[in-house]
């Protein structure tokens, strides 16, 4: 288990307060966008608006993550997108826009309010993504709260190989603190606007 300094432990408490305040504010301010996206998803394809999936949380506990549904109902369950033979065939029309813009991740604000996720942290792995979970163990990256965005997300995202992604998650844990979270937060704005690192079926196209 990763050992944290006293200042890092204190920051974890502060970070939780920041998460609650910002996620509550985001839910209120973005309620109009949630409504529009819910209507678009319902009109576009058959199925529920939200997609739930078992993911790995802090200390490798499991929780259900929330996303806007972007794929058809016949998509193989609990399978990472990069393991699908042709992921494009399962993605809905609205889903393509949501995934490219990262708006499909917005319902995770609920996960943050519930205390299962943080705004910044390693992206939560699928419960059966054993290769990524094992690699993260080497760096203590399973010992922090998973995040809506993180260091690996702004440094390659889907283009990264599993081992490279885990190393970046480990780098985040090593430098865990307010400054690192600020870098990830503002780096995310640039990454989302440029669609940087979004590759359907990735991990990954970027060379190690």
What are these regions (language model features)?
Residues 51-90, 148-168:
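Short, glycine-rich, amphipathic interfacial segments at transmembrane boundaries or analogous
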Residues 110-208:
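Hydrophobic structural segments characteristic of membrane proteins
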Residues 11, 15, 84, 88-91, ...:
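Short, structured helix-loop boundary elements
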């Amino acid at each position: 288990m990763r050992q944290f300094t006293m200042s890092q432990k204190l920051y974890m408490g502060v970070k939780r307060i920041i998460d609650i305040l910002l996620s509550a504010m985001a839910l209120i301010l973005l309620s109009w966008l949630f409504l529009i996206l819910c209507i678009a998803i319902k009109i576009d394809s058959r199925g529920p608006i939200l997609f739930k999936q078992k993911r790995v949380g802090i200390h490798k506990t499991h929780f259900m993550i929330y996303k806007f549904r972007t794929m058809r109902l016949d998509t193989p369950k609990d399978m990472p997108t990069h393991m699908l033979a042709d992921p494009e065939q399962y993605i809905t029309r609205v889903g393509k826009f949501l995934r490219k813009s990262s708006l499909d991740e917005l319902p995770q604000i609920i996960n943050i309010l519930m205390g299962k996720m943080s705004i910044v942290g390693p992206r939560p792995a699928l419960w059966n993504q054993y290769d990524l979970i094992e690699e993260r163990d080497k760096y203590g990256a399973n010992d922090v709260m998973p995040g809506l965005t993180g260091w690996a997300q702004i440094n390659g995202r889907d283009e990264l190989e599993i081992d490279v992604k885990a190393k970046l998650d480990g780098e985040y844990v090593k430098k865990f603190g307010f400054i690192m979270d600020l870098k990830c937060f503002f780096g995310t704005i640039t990454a989302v606007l440029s669609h940087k690192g979004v590759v359907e079926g990735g991990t990954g196209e970027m060379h190690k």
